[in-house]
A protein has these predicted regions:
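Electropositive phosphate-/nucleotide-binding environments in soluble metabolic enzymes
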Residues: 11, 98, 102-106
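Ser/Thr/Pro/Gly-rich low-complexity linker/stalk segments immediately outside membranes or between
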Residues: 30-44
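N-terminal, Lys/Arg-enriched amphipathic/low-complexity engagement segments
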Residues: 43-101
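Membrane-embedded segments
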Residues: 103, 109-115, 119-167
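Hydrophobic membrane-insertion alpha-helices, especially the h-region
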Residues: 10-28
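Short, Lys/Arg-rich N-terminal segment immediately upstream of the first membrane anchor
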Residues: 1-8
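A substrate-binding/cap region within the structured catalytic cores of diverse enzymes
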Residues: 168-197
Length: 197
């Protein structure tokens, strides 16, 4: 009876041995390639994680169930200092949550590299009370890369940001700075909101 060459046991064994050799070489020849700024990204993420942990030890309010990463940086839907309330079709909460993850600091480091910001550079920064997580991520990236920010911040916040009157962004920033958790503080503050120029 006729058997095609590929079905012969000898050929199948040779193919199996060849495949095993290829798998062995593939597994043992892998090389880890790190992106530019990898060490700064890891450091910034670690700094942000420690900053959030320290901040949580200083606050006296219950962390919202909406705060998926339990950062303590997600505010309330509306308050006396809310500059823009969430309306149907405008999801402000997800953006507030996203920037509270420590990996957001690594994303800021990536942006620094894209903008060719280097160690010892001085940068101008405008912070908003609407995104306290992004503010802390930026400060963490600055610390990791030894970049000095000159900061102007807004005191108000949109829904879910630093909009608790007793924990507005200026108060959070002062609390972190006075407890030596962050190295930089705003040089000026604006009220915030739509008419803030």
């Amino acid at each position: 009876m006729f058997r095609p060459q590929i079905q012969k046991t000898r050929v199948l064994v040779l193919i199996a041995i060849f495949n095993l050799l290829m798998v062995y070489f593939a597994v043992n020849s892998k090389v880890k390639v790190y992106q530019v700024g990898y060490d700064h990204k890891i450091e910034a993420s670690s700094i942000m994680e420690k900053t959030i942990k320290s901040y949580k030890s200083l606050i006296d309010y219950e962390i919202s169930k909406n705060d998926l990463f339990s950062s303590g940086l997600v505010g309330v839907k509306t308050s006396l200092i809310t500059t823009k309330e969430e309306v149907e079709g405008l999801d402000l909460l997800s953006s507030k949550i996203a920037c509270t993850h420590p990996n957001f600091a690594a994303a800021i480091v990536e942006m620094f590299y894209e903008m060719d910001i280097k160690e010892s550079d001085i940068i101008a920064v405008s912070m908003t009370g609407s995104l306290p997580g992004a503010n802390i991520a930026l400060l963490s990236a600055c610390k990791a890369m030894n970049v000095k920010p000159v900061i102007i911040s807004s005191g108000g916040s949109s829904s879910w940001g630093a909009n608790r009157p007793e924990y507005s962004w200026p108060k959070i920033e002062s609390l972190l700075y006075e407890n030596n958790i962050i190295d930089y503080k705003s040089v000026a503050y604006a009220i915030g909101g739509g008419n803030d120029l």
